[in-house]
UniProtKB/Swiss-Prot annotation:
Role summary: Required for nuclear import of FGF1, but not that of FGF2. Might regulate nuclear import of exogenous FGF1 by facilitating interaction with the nuclear import machinery and by transporting cytosolic FGF1 to, and possibly through, the nuclear pores.
Lineage: Eukaryota, Metazoa, Chordata, Craniata, Vertebrata
Keyword vocabulary terms for this entry: Acetylation, Coiled coil, Endoplasmic reticulum, Leucine-rich repeat, Membrane, Microsome, Nucleus, Phosphoprotein, Repeat, Signal-anchor, Transmembrane, Transmembrane helix
Bilayer-crossing regions: 245-265
Organism encoding this protein: Bos taurus (Bovine)
Lumenal side: 266-306
Protein's UniProt name: Leucine-rich repeat-containing protein 59
Length: 306
């Protein structure tokens, strides 16, 4: 087998206007670099070669308008084949293609397509039709584009669905993580509160013990004088109302004097004296008055009025 550069020869020598014919060149590789240097070659014929794949940089030949890849051994097209947005005519007759890349839907300029003699997927084969004449090949291009757009839309929906599933899964995971973090925060908060409460109780207990220790010496000092005082003889309580006692004693003394004078005036020889005569008269009147209860009634009346 021959490499692309050898039997391809000087590509400029094969260029006829805008057409470049590399058919029947026994190529097993596409000379992409040489082709990229010929942007005028908008019509490229690579039919009847031994190509099994197209390199990804082949899709950079966006100047291509007509491309003939018939009668090769292509099993698949590059994933970004849709970059050939100026392509209008595409011949894929007699290859080994089963499916087309989803990007095929981006070939909006495609007007003609031939997919005969390929082991196509049954659905794609039915869409493509027979391509027996010009009209059917044009219909094939239109129908395949519509089909690939539908496939692309389905894949996009599936991609969005998977993205949504992934987002939902991520949201659930994030919610689970937030719940876990909240639970951990709550646990730490509760532990901190319990630790604070424990320390507060210890502090209160320490203060209470300190207060008890401060009270004990006071009790001992209060009890010590009591014990000493119990051993000593009790002192008589101080006299109160000393002045009242003096007045009372004076009154008693006066009464004794009066009583003594009265006795002397009544019993002794002094009763004949003028002073004793007056005293005896007063005494007799007083006795008579008491007997008539006048003084007693006067006292009672005075008490009732008060």
């Amino acid at each position: 087998m021959t490499k692309a550069g050898s039997k391809g020869g000087n590509l400029r020598d094969k260029l006829d206007g805008n057409e470049l014919d590399l058919s029947l060149s026994d190529l097993n590789e596409v000379p992409v670099k040489e082709l990229a240097a010929l942007p005028k070659a908008t019509v490229l014929d690579l039919s009847c070669n031994k190509l099994t794949t197209l390199p990804s940089d082949f899709c950079g030949l966006t100047h291509l308008v007509k491309l003939d890849l018939s009668k090769n051994k292509l099993r698949q097209l590059p994933a970004d084949f849709g970059r050939l947005v100026n392509l209008q005519h595409l011949d894929l007759l007699n290859n080994r293609l089963v499916t087309l890349p989803v990007s095929f839907a981006q070939l909006k300029s495609l007007k003609w397509l031939d997919l005969k003699d390929n082991p196509l997927d049954p659905v794609l084969a039915k869409v493509a039709g027979d391509c027996l004449d010009e009209k059917q090949c044009k219909q094939c291009a239109n129908k395949v584009l519509q089909h690939m757009k539908a496939v692309q839309a389905d894949q996009e929906r599936e991609r969005q669905r998977r993205l949504e599933i992934d987002r939902e899964a991520e949201k659930k995971w994030e919610a689970k993580q937030r719940a876990k973090e909240a639970q951990e925060r709550e646990l730490r908060k509760r532990e901190k509160a319990e630790e604070k409460e424990r320390r507060r109780k210890e502090y209160d207990a320490l203060k209470a013990a300190k207060r008890e220790q401060e009270k004990k010496p006071k009790k001992e000092t209060n009890q010590a004088p009591k014990s000493k005082s119990s051993s000593r003889p009790r002192k008589p309580p101080p006299r109160k109302h000393t002045r009242s006692w003096a007045v009372l004693k004076l009154l008693l003394l006066l009464l004794l004097c009066v009583a003594g004078g009265l006795v002397a005036c009544r019993v002794t020889e002094l009763q004949q004296q003028p002073l004793c005569t007056s005293v005896n008269t007063i005494y007799d009147n007083a006795v008579r008055g008491l007997r008539s209860h006048d003084i007693l009634q006067w006292v009672l009346q005075t008490d009732s009025q008060q």
